[in-house]
């Protein structure tokens, strides 16, 4: 029997995803037409022995989360529960705090995955890989190859090339350690809790010595990467399964468009029915496009490649949309143009207006390049990135919004370039 745990974080996390995370918890943001988390849940539900999926985070239970959970349970016919942490306990602290719920029913193994990654989720391959190593005490990290420079932004894994054992693990090293990076997807057996428990006890001893008033809470904050993997490396217990299939983090809003492209591409294999096709009297599409059935699109509009159109969106005559996500209820009036942008819920773009951003894609000439997490400002200037309109933004006719971030509920009256409009 298997279980899966998805770590969804909380409202203090995902700040780089603002202003989109103001309206909806980041894990529920739609990527390729469905909430980010749904891709994880679907991959888990396809495993034959999967009995339960647990979401762990510190969001207050809210209507959106509850609605998503009840819909997902019906769609995937699997038990899905949300366990709320009382505070941010770290990637290891959360699963240790809820260890009784994870272990109830006696699972042989369980997956732990971060919500903010997009991947093909090679979960069956990870299970086979663990069986090949034949040791029920072994734990598996999903790894992939990055280029030397970008590897410094991730957890780096030094492996034994013959056995795939993790010999050394360093989280975000200061100098180059290895080009194999941690993908944030793990396969554990219940024995992992012994290792987390010993770190917890060690933390408690240190707290007692320090005589801190909030020592109990601090002892429970445990990070899988720094506290557990670093200690387990080289002990014959930790292995890395390397994948060459697509994988990316979804940290910034710009990376959501890139993740959307990867998932839309995957739909050819997994969900061809989700991809729009050119039909007589329908909108013209180029490349991979997702259109929600409730969207109203003029047949003279041209969409794609890499576009997803949400519920109740209205798109007028002669509109051009490319490399963008258009969210619920937005209106794109006649002859407007949207490139490399995310248009927020219920926003309106006037006639002949142009909303354009700069793509933050990985270097296409480097097969191992990952998406860069650019800082918001460089040399005192806003780094060019995709344009984001928060919810309920009104763009008047015939203006240009370029490389800008517009916070919710703004009525603009002129063009803007390289600005954050508060």
UniProtKB/Swiss-Prot annotation:
A GO term, aspect molecular function: GTP binding
Region named Hexapeptide repeat domain: 275-422
Superkingdom in the source lineage: Eukaryota
InterPro entries xrefs: GMPPB_C, Hexapep_transf_CS, Mannose-1P_guanyltransferase, NTP_transferase_dom, Nucleotide-diphossugar_trans
GO cellular component terms, semicolon-separated: cytoplasm
Region (C-loop): 358-386
Pathway assignment: Nucleotide-sugar biosynthesis; GDP-alpha-D-mannose biosynthesis; GDP-alpha-D-mannose from alpha-D-mannose 1-phosphate (GTP route): step 1/1
Keywords: GTP-binding, Nucleotide-binding, Nucleotidyltransferase, Transferase
Effect of disrupting the coding gene: Morpholino knockdown of both gmppaa and gmppab results in muscle damage and shortened motor neurons.
Keyword Cytoplasm: no
Pfam families, A to Z: GMPPB_C (PF25087), NTP_transferase (PF00483)
GO biological process, one term: GDP-mannose biosynthetic process
Binding site for GDP-alpha-D-mannose: 85, 249
Region (Substrate-binding domain): 2-253
Domains (record comment): The N-terminal substrate-binding domain adopts a Rossman-like fold and has a binding pocket for GTP or GDP-alpha-D-mannose. The C-terminal domain consists of a series of tandem hexapeptide repeats that adopt a beta-helix conformation. The beta-helix forms several protein interaction surfaces involved in assembly of the GMPPA-GMPPB mannose-1-phosphate guanylyltransferase complex. A loop extending from the C-terminal domain (C-loop) is involved in interaction with other subunits of the GMPPA-GMPPB complex and may be involved in allosteric inhibition of gmppb catalytic activity by gmppa.
Annotated function: Regulatory subunit of the GMPPA-GMPPB mannose-1-phosphate guanylyltransferase complex; reduces the catalytic activity of GMPPB when part of the complex. Mediates allosteric feedback inhibition of GMPPB catalytic activity upon binding GDP-alpha-D-mannose. Together with GMPPB regulates GDP-alpha-D-mannose levels. One of two paralogs (gmppaa and gmppab) that may have redundant functions.
Listed PANTHER family: SUGAR-1-PHOSPHATE GUANYL TRANSFERASE (PTHR22572)
Subunit-structure text: Component of the GMPPA-GMPPB mannose-1-phosphate guanylyltransferase complex composed of 4 gmppa subunits and 8 gmppb subunits; the complex is organized into three layers, a central layer made up of 2 gmppa dimers sandwiched between two layers each made up of 2 gmppb dimers.
Similarity-based family: Belongs to the transferase hexapeptide repeat family.
The protein, known as: Mannose-1-phosphate guanylyltransferase regulatory subunit alpha-A
Source organism of this protein record: Danio rerio
Encoding gene per record: gmppaa
């Amino acid at each position: 029997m298997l279980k899966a745990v998805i770590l969804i974080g909380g409202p203090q996390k995902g700040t780089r995803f603002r202003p989109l995370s103001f309206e909806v918890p980041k894990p529920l943001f739609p990527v390729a037409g469905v909430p980010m988390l749904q891709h994880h849940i679907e991959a888990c539900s396809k495993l034959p022995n999967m009995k339960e999926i647990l979401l762990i985070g510190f969001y207050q239970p809210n209507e959106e989360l509850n609605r998503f959970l009840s819909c997902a349970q019906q769609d995937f016919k699997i038990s899905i529960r949300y366990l709320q942490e009382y505070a941010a306990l770290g990637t290891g602290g959360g699963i240790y705090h809820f260890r009784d719920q994870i272990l109830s029913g006696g699972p042989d193994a369980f997956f732990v995955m971060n919500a903010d990654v997009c991947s093909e989720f090679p979960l069956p391959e990870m299970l086979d890989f663990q069986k090949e190593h034949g040791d029920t005490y072994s734990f598996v990290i999903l790894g992939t190859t990055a280029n030397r420079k970008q590897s410094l932004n991730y957890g780096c894994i030094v492996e034994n090339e013959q056995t795939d054992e993790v010999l050394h693990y360093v989280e975000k090293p200061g100098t180059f350690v290895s080009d194999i990076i941690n993908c944030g997807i793990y396969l554990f057996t219940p024995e992992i809790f012994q290792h987390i428990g010993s770190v917890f006890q060690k933390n408690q001893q240190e707290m007692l010595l320090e005589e801190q008033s909030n020592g109990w809470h601090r002892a429970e904050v445990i990070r899988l990467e720094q506290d557990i993997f670093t200690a387990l490396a080289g002990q014959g217990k930790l292995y890395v399964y390397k994948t060459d299939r697509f994988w990316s983090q979804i940290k910034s809003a710009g990376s959501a468009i890139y993740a959307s492209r990867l998932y839309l591409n995957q739909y050819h294999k997994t969900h061809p029915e989700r991809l729009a096709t050119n039909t007589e009297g329908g909108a013209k599409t180029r490349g991979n496009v997702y259109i929600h059935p409730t969207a109203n699109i003029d047949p003279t509009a041209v969409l794609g490649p890499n576009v997803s159109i949400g519920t109740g969106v209205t798109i007028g005559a002669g509109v051009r949309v490319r490399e963008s996500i258009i969210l619920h209820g937005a209106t794109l009036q006649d002859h407007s143009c949207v490139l490399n942008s995310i248009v927020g819920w219920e926003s309106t773009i006037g006639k002949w207006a142009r909303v354009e951003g700069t793509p933050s894609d990985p270097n296409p000439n480097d097969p191992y390049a990952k998406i860069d997490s650019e800082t918001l400002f460089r040399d005192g200037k806003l780094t060019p990135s995709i344009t984001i309109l928060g919810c309920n933004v009104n763009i008047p006719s015939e203006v240009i919004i370029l490389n800008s971030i517009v916070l919710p509920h703004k009525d603009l009256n002129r063009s803007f370039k390289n600005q954050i409009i508060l």
